[in-house]
Amino acid sequence: MKKSITTLDLNLLLCLQLLMQERSVTKAAKRINVTPSAVSKSLAKLRAWFDDPLFVNSPLGLSPTPLMVSMEQNLAEWMQMSNLLLDKPHHQTPRGLKFELAAESPLMMIMLNALSKQIYQRYPQATIKLRNWDYDSLDAITRGEVDIGFSGRESHPRSRELLSSLPLAIDYEVLFSDVPCVWLRKDHPALHQTWNLDTFLRYPHISICWEQSDTWALDNVLQELGRERTIAMSLPEFEQSLFMAAQPDNLLLATAPRYCQYYNQLHQLPLVALPLPFDESQQKKLEVPFTLLWHKRNSHNPKIVWLRETIKNLYASMA
């Protein structure tokens, strides 16, 4: 028989979401500042109400049951709606508005000043929180911790970062596509040699650790050719790789999106950009569609719609 929500303590649903996120009774307890015993008792009540174990112990922590997995999206949406309801008194005026974004650092830095001006012009008391895009950012959008993400995806058929691989709950719009370039200092010895694949692979490379991986579509293309680059340094951000490639007497090559030219101009880095030495079909596999990402529940949220349109217009003016 269907149970009434009036028989459930709604605080238990917060505990359930934290258990799903943390996969640990102890970690969930720390999040809400209670004892692990209290969380265990809450889990026991939830198991009785749903008539399901919800989680089972595994070597990696709590593993959700099929029922729990099926409820995850609904639970996240319920929590998001609850937060919006509780924040309603603070969001009746612009004073309460908060804009939370996750983006690749140089991608956002080249337009953050212009974006913040437009936000403050419309919402003078708003606050802006910007975080770097990382492996957890899509989950942060799902959890309601990020309004909009702005990140590059990949085009190589074997990539895990294809647009077609995005979670069903995520909506997106491609703002522009970019093909990465090779960035090297203006007096690099490679500039005095024929620019081809052999020259490209002759020198050590800086790699970007992207969503917990040191390799990307470039390495897939090289593997298809039976070749491999020497990765001498791995860094978390494109701007760090450009900074290192620009250092005097440095033989390192950085591969970064063409849009980084705006970043180089801002910081006057002594770098030259060369095309990746591949044919047209290989270049196509390296295309990076830079994409706005948001949760479907926010598709008609006036704040998110306005933010999306503002970012789109800013990048259109740069094209």
From Swiss-Prot:
Domain of life: Bacteria
DNA-binding region: 25-44
Cysteine pairs bridged by disulfides in the record: none
InterPro entries, sorted: LysR-type_TF (IPR050389), LysR_subst-bd (IPR005119), Tscrpt_reg_HTH_LysR (IPR000847), Tscrpt_reg_YidZ (IPR023746), WH-like_DNA-bd_sf (IPR036388), WH_DNA-bd_sf (IPR036390), YidZ_PBP2 (IPR037402)
GO aspect biological process, one term: DNA-templated transcription
An annotated Gene Ontology molecular function: DNA binding
Record-annotated HTH lysR-type domain positions: 8-65
Keywords annotated in UniProt: DNA-binding, Transcription, Transcription regulation
Keyword Transport in record: no
Coiled coil: none
Family from the record: Belongs to the LysR transcriptional regulatory family.
Record's function text: Involved in anaerobic NO protection.
NCBIfam families given in the database record: PRK10216.1
This protein's name: HTH-type transcriptional regulator YidZ
Record gene name: yidZ
